[in-house]
Amino acid sequence: MNSKCEFCDYKSFSQQLLLETSRTYLIYPRRPIFTYHFMFVPKEHAPYFISFSDESLIDMKATMKLVVGKLSKSKEGFIGYNLVSNNGDKRVGQKVPHYHCHMFLRRDDEEISPYTLMNNRDLTDDSDGEKREADFNILKKKLAE
């Protein structure tokens, strides 16, 4: 636990929390690339993938399986997913020095890849907070089923 770390401070992301296990938080990003964008954050503070415990890794994997399993059953045309993590300083894209992994559930009807959106954030509409909140509530309900 690091008192200066955003992901160690539960209050800083509690409004984004979709699911919590004994060792993992599932967070909906403040600026999602698209609706099915998730962040898996180990509760254990470690800056890099290779730094956190095997127990946390096992729990994070189980949480990923749970999310993919629940949402794949929703018949929304999911065709797979991407996992992305940045390990290093800000120059490699790791803005918070606490390991976390982004998951993008991919759909057969998507018009633009999340990688294109990540590389050109002008293509995403950050101004629509109502849509983000509606997406968050829908996802939270699906994951609770």
Specify the residue positions occupied by each region the protein language model found.
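HIT superfamily nucleotide-processing domains
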Residues: 1-145
